[in-house]
Amino acid sequence: MAKKSMIAKAARAPKFKVRGYTRCQICGRPHSVYKDFGICRVCLRKMANEGLIPGLKKASW
């Protein structure tokens, strides 16, 4: 889990636009966040395996 202070800092508008970054809405992870879902790869995989995201399933070939 991310620190509460870092999550609050990311929520504020940055002084310069290029300094903005995305965080996972569930765990607050700053890296590997999918913009389509708004969550990180770890949470996306967990939710997909539990069937919480409609239309998304684990690939097998």
Curated annotation (Swiss-Prot):
**Cofactor(s) listed in the protein's UniProt record:** Zn(2+)
Per the entry, the cofactor note is: Binds 1 zinc ion per subunit.
InterPro entries registered for this protein in UniProt: Ribosomal_uS14, Ribosomal_uS14_bact, Ribosomal_uS14_CS, Ribosomal_uS14_sf
Residues that bind Zn(2+): C24, C27, C40, C43
* GO CC terms of this entry: cytoplasm; small ribosomal subunit
Q: Which domain of life is it from?
A: Bacteria
A Pfam family this protein belongs to?
A: Ribosomal_S14
SUPFAM superfamilies assigned to the protein according to its UniProt record, in alphabetical order: Glucocorticoid receptor-like (DNA-binding domain) (SSF57716)
GO BP term, example: translation
Molecular function GO labels: rRNA binding; structural constituent of ribosome; zinc ion binding
Q: Which UniProt keywords apply?
A: Metal-binding, Ribonucleoprotein, Ribosomal protein, RNA-binding, rRNA-binding, Zinc
Q: Subunit details for this protein?
A: Part of the 30S ribosomal subunit. Contacts proteins S3 and S10.
Q: State the similarity comment.
A: Belongs to the universal ribosomal protein uS14 family. Zinc-binding uS14 subfamily.
Protein task:
Binds 16S rRNA, required for the assembly of 30S particles and may also be responsible for determining the conformation of the 16S rRNA at the A site.
Name the UniProt record assigns to this protein: Small ribosomal subunit protein uS14
Q: Which organism is it from?
A: Campylobacter curvus (strain 525.92)
According to the entry, what is the taxonomic lineage of the organism?
Answer: Bacteria, Pseudomonadati, Campylobacterota, Epsilonproteobacteria, Campylobacterales
